[in-house]
Amino acid sequence: MMRSIKSFIVAAAAALLVGCGTTTHVPVTGRKQNLLVSDQQILSLSGQQYKEYMQKAKPSSNAAQTAMVKRVGQRLATAVVNYLNANGLGSEVANYQWEFNLVENKSVNAFCMPGGKIVVYDGLLPVTQDEASLAIVLGHEIAHAVAKHSAERMSNAYKQQYGMSILSGVASAAGVSSDLTQLGTAALGVGAEAWSSGFSRSQESEADHIGLIFAAMAGYDPRVAVTFWQRMAAASTGGGSSIFSDHPSDAKRIKQIQGWMPEALKYYKGK
């Protein structure tokens, strides 16, 4: 009976953590996600951080490249918004203000902040080489924004934080020894870190998937994604994988993209 009571308390605590927040579904993939952070909260925070970043960043002096980034970005954003509106999901990005900026930074990278603020480093362009490959990158970044990955990661951080506290409190209330409580807390800490990194890899894969579809929707040939990521693999340093890595391995990423290609081509051929 005592064991049953302990199990009930732990289960109730777990349900308390996952039962709050807003449940939504990610566009394209349909994956269910539970968000504890509202759009208003995260857009307010990220908007200020983006403003501070752009005040310090140096915009690219290459007018042609800057125009290309903005042109490809807006073409993608238009296609994405049209798709969301057609599927009754327009409210998900109603407060987004899409912005695409090229800055001087020789790193091979780009990043997205919530609300549609996307920054491309000019060091990425020698690897993208053409507009279609750039669309693959921007589609990936737009996917992070549309899928609300930042809000999801913040929500998961909250769950982990309170989960650690609840575990100790529940275990003590259930009569578990302090040694076992510490052991359980330590185990959850390791597990939480591994799960968080694994979830990040999952988000990156999801952004690859959604971004590929978005690029095809905008009329860019999604097949360029394979050769682009092969160039990215060659440009990156070190090819090893790790359980705590934030991104899928290059080989896994390319294999996944090839698996999604038939779906993407349906959108591309429909143009």
Provide a role label for each language-model segment.
Residues 3-9, 20-271:
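A Zn2+-metalloprotease active-site environment signal
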